[in-house]
Amino acid sequence: MKHTPISRRDFLKNLGIAGAGTLLAASPWLSAFSEVMNTSNEKCRLAIIGPGSRGRFLMGFLAKNPKVDIVALCDIYKPSIENALKLAPNAKVYGDYREVLEDKSIDAILVATPLSSHCKIVLDAFDAGKHVFCEKSIGFTMEECYRMYQKHRSTGKIFFTGQQRLFDPRYIKAMEMIHAGTFGEINAIRTFWNRNGDWRRSVPSPNLERLINWRLYKEFSKGLMTELACHQLQIGSWALRKIPEKVMGHGAITYWKDGRDVYDNVS
């Protein structure tokens, strides 16, 4: 099988950063991608578990990747499957993710289901010998995150998550500058994310409310902190290269009094 390597210099050039040492000091996980191999005849046979709005957004990119073959779709909501088939018309359809994992020909899965379901699916996928991309946030609790990490380590399978800022050239460049001391000593960081929408999606029937608007209910979601603020919190830890020792926060439902039970504002 023929391999065409992309040089580290070209890889870094594409990020707009000149020095490998500085880059990898700021973003050490990129070392795994510093020599990318283009294979001539192999594709990753991928299953999408949860091809809802986020899953289909990712499918839009994957469908253009010549090294990916989306071979399976799994969802309990028929309209999601119907829309996903427009992007992957030859994919096999499933209603139970466990049946997907039984298919030995599938190399990897992409998990874009409600947060509360991530851990079980990911653990089962590792046990089935699959590589995993799991959308953020990874787990419903810290204990779940630890279990998934340990399973990843014990199985040796690839585990990737959707914290996209880690690969955003703008953030990588900013961290390079921060860690190089360009702005002096960093004593405080303030991050913001403002949205003025109600975070709701229309439902065809009231009995589908929690299935479709799962982000609004504590049974399935941790609300704004895991669905949006996780990106901002990551920036702080990345910039300071530290994990917080203490955390204080507050939130409330002050505007969208529509039956949701997660806060509509947090800080």
What is each residue range found by the language model?
Residues 114-115, 119-167, 181:
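Beta-strand-loop-alpha-helix segment that lines the small-molecule cofactor/substrate pocket
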Residues 56, 119, 230:
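Residues forming the Rossmann-fold NAD(P)(H) cofactor-binding site
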